Amino acid sequence: IALGAKMAKADGRVTRDEVTAFREVFHIPPSDERAAARVFNLAREDVAGFEDYAKRIAAMFRSNDKPCGQDSVLCDLMEGLFYIAAADGAYHPEEDAFLERVAVIFGLDGALFERMRARHVPGGPPDPYAVLGVDPRADLETVRQAWRAEVRATHPDRMLARGIPEEAVKLAEARLSAINAAWDRIRTGRGA
């Protein structure tokens, strides 16, 4: 909750759209809403201290073999933070710096961070190669394999099976749409 609130404040102000996005990403049982609101309101006062929250979260969820693999809670949380950052229709340099620092703390690989940014940042169609995490010079079969791996990892049914809240599954659906659109653009562009 605190990290999401600090993300919303990263550009200097918390908008209604960001609060709505926060509620879509983080499922809070009705019995905990008052306490969660207090934590959110305290945390959104200032961005300072976000690194400590990120470190604690990373320590709780990082697995030894893959600090932020495709099935990682940390990756799901990063996707949620991107969603909050882009909720107001603008993506500010301060938000980018915040997310980049959190990604480093989470152990997120740079290419995966770029793919997430390409999927979420508003303003023009994302680079389809960045969305799929492949080099533009890769052959079509390599691109297809990357697309299939992303679809498998992102499929909403798989997310539900992992116990991800339904609200977060909406993010997976948007992510899957971006992945499929990237594959379609590449395939069409190459005449396949």
What label would you give each PLM region?
Residues I1-M7, R13-A192:
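Small-residue-enriched hydrophobic alpha-helices in membranes
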